[in-house]
Amino acid sequence: MAGSPLLCGPRAGGVGLLVLLLLGLLRLPPTLSARPVKEPRSLSAASAPLAETSTPLRLRRAVPRGEAAGAVQELARALAHLLEAERQERARAEAQEAEDQQARVLAQLLRAWGSPRASDPPLAPDDDPDAPAAQLARALLRARLDPAALAAQLVPAPAPAAALRPRPPVYDDGPTGPDVEDAADETPDVDPELLRYLLGRILTGSSEPEAAPAPRRLRRAVDQDLGPEVPPENVLGALLRVKRLENSSPQAPARRLLPP
């Protein structure tokens, strides 16, 4: 309480007066604290008047004590209110001081960020409140930005290790586009009869080429290739087998006898 602004500022008179009133009410009046002096009374005096005068005296003592207790409670509430106001004023002053400190730190950071190079002549510190650095510092304070976060934004962060790794080379697979697809579609089709013939050879597993009949297209190719020269013996044998297959009639299917 010694360094309180309420005791040293313009409110010191009101607080001092409340403290004095509180001390005065806590101290009992001398009429209540002094012991009453017993007056000598005669033996012939009656005891009834004494009983009548004792009751108002007891009431008079009880009434000031109740008023004093109520006044003490009022003063205690007023003193608590003043102490709460003092605490709020102190917290407000501390917040203002912290805001001023942040403003000074931001101004120094901005001044260091925009400082000229070593070759340039040094400039005098700018304390103008309308300077760009001060205006930016006030704007940042209004936005409640952290000075540490601002410093982290001003200093460039190191590049991650993943960005420094070399990328694999990109190989050119040739031109792509609709023209290439059209060119791929122009490939010659395979004869389905030849495919069926080859598939039958693979499934039967026969090693002799004469085991299965050749397709008609192959027979025509053999007939067209025959010229005035004498064909070899294996070609003549193949032609004879083909002719026998063409002349032979298909066998009738056997009839199944049904039971009577």
Curated annotation (Swiss-Prot):
Stretches the record annotates as C-terminal inhibitory domain: 221-260
Entry superkingdom: Eukaryota
Entry's Gene Ontology cellular component terms: extracellular space; secretory granule; trans-Golgi network
Region (Disordered) residue spans: 162-187, 206-234
Signal peptide: 1-33
Tissue-specificity statement: Expressed in adult brain (all major structural regions), adrenal gland (medulla) and spinal cord (dorsal and ventral horn). Expressed in pancreatic islands.
Keyword NAD among record annotations: no
Region (ProSAAS(1-180)): 34-215
Record-level GO BP terms: neuropeptide signaling pathway; peptide hormone processing; response to cold; response to dietary excess
Keyword Ligase: no
Chain span(s) of sequence motif Sufficient for inhibition of PCSK1: 239-244
Keyword entries, A-Z: Cleavage on pair of basic residues, Golgi apparatus, Neuropeptide, Secreted, Signal
Subcellular location: Secreted; Golgi apparatus, trans-Golgi network
Principal place of residence: secreted
InterPro entries in UniProt: ProSAAS
Subunit structure: Interacts via the C-terminal inhibitory domain with PCSK1 65 kDa form.
UniProt function note: May function in the control of the neuroendocrine secretory pathway. Proposed be a specific endogenous inhibitor of PCSK1. ProSAAS and Big PEN-LEN, both containing the C-terminal inhibitory domain, but not the processed peptides reduce PCSK1 activity in the endoplasmic reticulum and Golgi. It reduces the activity of the 87 kDa form but not the autocatalytically derived 65 kDa form of PCSK1. Subsequent processing of proSAAS may eliminate the inhibition. Slows down convertase-mediated processing of proopiomelanocortin and proenkephalin.
Domain notes: ProSAAS(1-180) increases secretion of enzymatically inactive PCSK1. The C-terminal inhibitory domain is involved in inhibition of PCSK1. It corresponds to the probable processing intermediate Big PEN-LEN, binds to PCSK1 in vitro and contains the hexapeptide L-L-R-V-K-R, which, as a synthetic peptide, is sufficient for PCSK1 inhibition.
The name this protein goes by in its record: ProSAAS
Protein species of origin: Rattus norvegicus
Gene: Pcsk1n
